[in-house]
Swiss-Prot record:
Chain's role: Catalyzes the conversion of (8S)-3',8-cyclo-7,8-dihydroguanosine 5'-triphosphate to cyclic pyranopterin monophosphate (cPMP).
Pathway in which this enzyme or protein is active: Cofactor biosynthesis; molybdopterin biosynthesis
Protein name: Cyclic pyranopterin monophosphate synthase
Entry superkingdom: Bacteria
Organism the protein comes from: Pseudomonas putida (strain ATCC 47054 / DSM 6125 / CFBP 8728 / NCIMB 11950 / KT2440)
Reactions performed catalytically: (8S)-3',8-cyclo-7,8-dihydroguanosine 5'-triphosphate = cyclic pyranopterin phosphate + diphosphate
Family: Belongs to the MoaC family.
Amino acid sequence: MLTHLDSQGRANMVDVTEKAVTEREATAEARVRMLPQTLQMIVDGEHPKGDVFAVARIAGIQAAKKTSDLIPLCHPLMLTSVKVELSAEGQDAVRIVARCKLAGQTGVEMEALTAASVAALTIYDMCKAVDKGMVIEQVRLLEKLGGKSGHYKVEA
């Protein structure tokens, strides 16, 4: 059953008024594949626009806080923690892992996915002058804890 549709198939925001406040956490990831020399420039701190990882981390955190402004039926949430980790993966990729937490009545999956996605978009934006062929891929939910649907963890 799609919870964002009413009995007549119209979009609506889910009413969470009666839901219990519980601890909730979600972790999402994204990857940005790029030329090896682009990744090396980022890792060596030689990008002319500055620290790519630092800017992408801040962008991801900001995006998590703005998710309800971007995704029409998401509730505005009082996130208690947003962490965005970026790391070089192999010779040609950046892996982004975003983790969001709160004590609330609805989950934080969309906030984690938005944080990872916007961090990836920020890397693309900062590096597009030197590598227009970058690919953002593998945006996905890794784990979700709390709430009625319980624990979800992607299979390795």
